[in-house]
C-alpha cells in the first residue's frame, strides 16, 4: 500500500469516527473538562469555554435516554447472576433518568423552560443519578472481572502456556478482561467527577481536580469508541 493510499485509509477511518454523534460528544467533553481544569472555577476565557461547551454537548444527548430505557426493558444475558441483573437495571434506570433530566436543564439554560430554580434543582438530581449509575457500573465491572478471572484460571489449569497464546476462547476472555478494566477505571474517574460537580467534598475535589478526572475519563471514552482493528487473515 502506497503512502497516499495509507493516508486515504486513515482519513476514511477518521471520518467514520467523527460521523458518530457519541464520538463528537466525547471530544467536546474532553474540551469541556480540559477547560475546567485550566480555569479552576475562576472567571475568564477557559470558564467561558467550559460553560459554552457544556451547553453545546446537551444537544448531542437529546433523546439519548431512550437507549438506556430500551436496555432497561430488554431481557438480561443468560447466565447472569441476579444481583448483577439488578445492578445493571439500576444503572440503566439511573442513566436514563440523568439523560432525561439533562434535557430539561438544557431547556432551562437556553430560556425555553422559564423556571430557573426548578431547572437547577433538576440539574442536581441529574448529577446524583450520574453518580449512582457510575457506582453501579464500578460494582458490575469488579464482579464481572472476578467471574472472568475464575474462568481464565480454569483454562490456565487445563492448557499449557503456549496453548493459551493460541487458544481463541482464552484470548477473547483476555480482551474482555482488558475492556472491563478500562471501563472500571472510567467509571471510577466519573464518580469523582460527579462528586466534584455536586460539591460533596469541595476542599478535596476542587474544580481543577474535577476537570483533570473528567478530561481523563473523556479520553478513555474517545478510545473506547475507536473502530476495532481489522483481524489479520
Swiss-Prot record:
Pfam families: PEX11. Residues 114-206 are lumenal. Expressed in seedlings, roots, shoots, leaf sheaths, flag leaf, panicles, spikelets, and endosperm. The chain crosses the membrane at residues 93-113, 207-226. Residues 1-92 are cytoplasmic. This is Peroxisomal membrane protein 11-5. Keywords: Membrane, Peroxisome, Peroxisome biogenesis, Transmembrane, Transmembrane helix. Induction: By abscisic acid, H(2)O(2) and salt stress. Down-regulated by nitrogen or phosphorous deprivation. Disulfide bonds: none annotated. It is a multi-pass membrane protein. It comes from the Eukaryota. It is found in: Peroxisome membrane. PANTHER family: PEROXISOMAL BIOGENESIS FACTOR 11, PEROXISOMAL MEMBRANE PROTEIN 11C-RELATED. Involved in peroxisomal proliferation.
Amino acid at each position: 500500500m502506497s503512502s497516499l493510499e495509507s493516508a486515504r485509509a486513515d482519513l476514511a477511518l477518521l471520518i467514520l469516527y467523527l460521523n458518530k454523534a457519541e464520538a463528537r460528544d466525547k471530544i467536546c467533553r474532553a474540551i469541556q473538562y480540559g477547560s475546567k481544569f485550566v480555569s479552576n472555577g475562576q472567571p475568564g476565557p477557559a470558564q467561558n469555554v467550559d460553560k459554552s461547551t457544556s451547553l453545546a454537548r446537551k444537544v448531542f444527548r437529546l433523546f439519548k435516554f431512550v437507549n438506556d430505557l430500551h436496555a432497561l426493558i430488554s431481557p438480561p444475558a443468560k447466565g447472569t447472576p441476579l444481583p448483577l441483573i439488578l445492578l445493571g437495571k439500576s444503572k440503566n434506570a439511573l442513566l436514563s433518568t440523568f439523560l432525561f433530566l439533562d434535557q430539561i436543564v438544557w431547556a432551562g439554560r437556553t430560556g425555553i423552560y422559564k423556571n430557573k430554580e426548578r431547572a437547577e434543582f433538576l440539574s442536581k438530581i441529574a448529577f446524583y443519578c450520574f453518580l449512582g449509575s457510575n457506582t453501579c457500573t464500578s460494582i458490575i465491572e469488579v464482579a464481572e472481572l472476578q467471574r472472568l478471572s475464575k474462568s481464565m484460571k480454569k483454562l490456565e489449569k487445563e492448557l499449557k502456556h503456549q496453548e493459551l497464546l493460541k487458544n481463541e476462547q482464552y484470548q477473547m476472555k483476555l480482551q474482555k478482561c482488558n475492556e472491563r478494566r478500562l471501563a472500571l477505571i472510567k467509571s471510577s474517574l466519573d464518580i469523582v467527577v460527579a462528586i466534584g460537580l455536586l460539591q460533596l467534598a469541595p476542599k478535596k475535589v476542587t474544580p481543577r481536580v474535577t476537570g483533570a478526572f473528567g478530561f481523563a475519563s473523556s479520553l478513555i471514552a474517545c478510545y473506547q469508541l475507536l473502530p476495532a482493528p481489522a483481524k489479520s487473515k
